[in-house]
Amino acid sequence: MVKIVLLVVFILILVYFSKYVIYAVFHPKTFFKYVYIDIRDYFKFKKYNRFTNYGVITMFTASGTQVFGSGKTISMIKDVIRIYKQYNNKLVYDPDEQVFKTQHIHIISNVELNGIPYIKFTGVNQFVDIDKYNFDSMDVAIYVLDESGAVFNSRQFKNNISSEMLTRLLQSRKNKCCLFMTSQRLQFTDIILRQICCVVYECSKKWRFVFLKAYNPLDLEYAYNPEIIKPKSTQLYFCDNNLYNSYNTNQLVENLNKKYTPLSNEEVLASYGNYTPSVDNLSSSRLKKSYNRRVRQREK
């Protein structure tokens, strides 16, 4: 019986990795050559120390009607702190100069962070003129923007998403940068930022438990109701006092009130773009079928 179970498991694994298995069978020399090379280089050049998830633009939004206290900011800060503690001051290999260097994680944030160093975010010139900081070639810059919709919907930032900034954002992987943002709703953020966003986390909070659902931004962009979309992944974590005390948003609120003059309603709506949700724009036929099925159920 055990042998049969093991055989079934083995067959399922082969089916799941069928494309890779087929390539390995027909190209064994090339396949196993690079398996050996990559495993060797992983340890030889300490690749486990490198932070390689730069180039990712991540948005945290509220779930359902829980616009406030949904865990958006604390989820963003949790990820940033994890990255800093895991990868800062780690020895990594620079393939261009062929030497080992110390990797530094530089955080540029409009949220006051406690316990880790950061550069205060004052304007989008910090995206365009990042070279002025003289970061090393193996250093990583992480931008942290809480309430990004409120920040970019101000007159001071009216023309901020310029071609230079857009170029920087699109080339963030080459520049070893990544961007974390929060917004009460995805559509509250400028349409340009929404279009280049990589993943959206919808957050909900009960007591100290925070539940996250990861979505493809394009699915949320064109869906009437996020509930019809199956999330790419889900996760649950618990907030302790250390996490609560790791940041302070009071200064952010004060800065928003003092420094930024809101745009008019017409200007804000223009920055959101022509938001016309349509089931025809959903990214897969599965989503369309799910939507149509729910509509039929409601009509019964």
Predicted regions and their residues:
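Loop/turn-to-beta-strand initiation segments
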Residues: 104, 139-142, 175-181
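Glycine-rich P-loop/Walker A and Walker A-like loops and their local beta1-loop-alpha1 context
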Residues: 57-90
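Feature marks short, highly hydrophobic, charge-poor N-terminal signal-anchor/signal peptide-like helices
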Residues: 1-8
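Phosphate-binding P-loop
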Residues: 50-59, 87-100
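Conserved P-loop NTPase motor module
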Residues: 213-300
